[in-house]
Curated annotation (Swiss-Prot):
Keywords: Electron transport, Heme, Iron, Membrane, Metal-binding, Mitochondrion, Mitochondrion inner membrane, Respiratory chain, Transmembrane, Transmembrane helix, Transport, Ubiquinone. One of its GO terms (molecular function) is metal ion binding. It comes from Pteronotus gymnonotus. Binds 2 heme b groups non-covalently. This is Cytochrome b. It is a multi-pass membrane protein. The lineage of its organism: Eukaryota, Metazoa, Chordata, Craniata, Vertebrata. InterPro entries: Cyt_b/b6_C (IPR005798), Cyt_b/b6_C_sf (IPR036150), Cyt_b/b6_N (IPR005797), Cytb/b6-like_sf (IPR027387), Cytochrome_b (IPR030689), Cytochrome_b_C_euk/bac (IPR048260), Cytochrome_b_N_euk/bac (IPR048259), Di-haem_cyt_TM (IPR016174). Heme 1 (or BL or b562) is low-potential and absorbs at about 562 nm, and heme 2 (or BH or b566) is high-potential and absorbs at about 566 nm. Component of the ubiquinol-cytochrome c reductase complex (complex III or cytochrome b-c1 complex) that is part of the mitochondrial respiratory chain. The b-c1 complex mediates electron transfer from ubiquinol to cytochrome c. Contributes to the generation of a proton gradient across the mitochondrial membrane that is then used for ATP synthesis.
Length: 379
């Protein structure tokens, strides 16, 4: 008799995605981050749901409601810090996941890659709106500065900003709508994840060698289920240590001061995971130019499949391209550091050089390195 998981209409979908799915036998631990992201999303939705039960999205009470969650609600403090630091874990996994896609040429599956870029934008939007909700100083001023960037759009900019604010400044209407969108977006992200997986399972997973692996596959269960569970346990251990030992390590102390429109913090900066984009934004002295560079710093991922000039898919056997990739990683770390520094010499010039280098590596140096490798291999 055929097993029910192979015949039942619903279980069959789960079976084809998580049990009998053929996976290349050579995939390494870098392929674990997809499942880690799913675990992060689950943690964020669960903790967020319980936080939303006690949070009030009103400028008069938002800050106090977060304080109330931490002080008076049973295990409220752990929910709040799991949610805040869970976002950091989410972005660590997200950036590694994108990096793995770049390194091993996973972007050649263009539909999966493009849905992934859409997911990246959605997660960034969700994280930004979530940062506004505690209504501390950095929440208020971060919201003011970042939404104000839209005023750089010619002709409709000012009207667009006031439409988003729901008034002439960031106020009650802004906070209420940000809470509504922050609650809604994770479910849209979950739906996009299903589409992402749908496209992935159309082609099958890539592998470190970058060559077709049809003759050499293993079933997803038990090999990769065990591997994924180990990865999830390691990530949850790291998250627990962060939450229990230094919950405010990645936060900003200014956010423990209630929002005050009359008092500007000395250094307005976003959470650490946006600092690289913030540094690119600040490195251009023109407002519209900065906004364009900010958007393009992420949107540039969409042109990477078009810039693939190598005859090989993966970077595993391409030392020149590997050098370019790790130079890009170092450059992004430099930008992250610069984004957290004040706007003064020498940080300004370092930021400008790192920003130019970021676009140069992706648009020029990586395709050139690939062409050189083709030539060296006489292809």
């Amino acid at each position: 008799m055929t097993n029910i998981r192979k015949t039942h209409p619903l279980l069959k979908i789960v079976n084809d995605s998580l049990v009998d799915l053929p996976v290349p036998s050579s995939v390494s631990s870098w392929w674990n981050f997809g499942s880690l992201l799913a675990a992060c999303l689950a943690v964020q939705i669960l903790t967020g749901l319980f936080l939303a039960m006690h949070y009030t999205s009103d400028t008069a009470t938002a800050f106090n409601s977060v304080t109330h969650i931490c002080r008076d609600v049973n295990y409220g403090w752990i929910l709040r810090y799991l949610h805040a630091n869970g976002a950091s874990m989410f972005f660590i996994c997200l950036y590694i996941h994108v990096g793995r896609g770049l390194y091993y040429g996973s972007y050649m599956y263009s539909e999966t890659w493009n849905i992934g870029i859409l997911l990246l934008f959605a997660v960034m939007a969700t994280a930004f709106m979530g940062y506004v909700l505690p209504w501390g100083q950095m929440s208020f001023w971060g919201a003011t500065v970042i939404t104000n960037l839209l005023s750089a759009i010619p002709y409709i900019g000012t009207d667009l900003v006031q439409w988003i604010w729901g008034g002439f400044s960031v106020d009650k209407a802004t906070l209420t709508r940000f809470f509504a969108f922050h609650f809604l977006l994770p479910f849209i992200i979950a739906a996009l994840v299903v589409v992402h997986l749908l496209f992935l399972h159309e082609t099958g997973s890539s592998n470190p060698t970058g060559i077709p692996s049809d003759p050499d596959m293993v079933p997803f269960h038990p090999y990769h289920t065990i591997k994924d569970i180990l990865g999830i346990l390691m990530m949850l251990t790291a998250l627990s240590m962060l939450v229990l030992f230094s919950p405010d390590l990645l936060g900003d102390p200014d956010n423990y001061i209630p929002a005050n429109p009359l008092n500007t913090p000395p250094h307005i900066k976003p959470e650490w995971y946006f600092l690289f984009a913030y540094a690119i934004l600040r490195s251009i002295p023109n407002k519209l130019g900065g906004v364009l560079a900010l958007v393009l710093s992420i949107l540039i991922l969409a042109v990477i499949p078009l810039l693939h000039t190598s005859k090989q898919r993966s970077m595993m056997f391409r030392p020149l391209s590997q050098c370019m990739f790790w130079l890009l990683v170092a450059d992004l770390l430099t930008l992250t550091w610069i984004g957290g520094q004040p706007v003064e010499h020498p940080y300004i010039i370092i930021g400008q050089m790192a920003s130019i280098l970021y676009f140069t590596i992706i648009l020029l140096l990586m395709p050139l390195a690939s062409m050189m490798e083709n030539h060296l291999l006489k292809w």
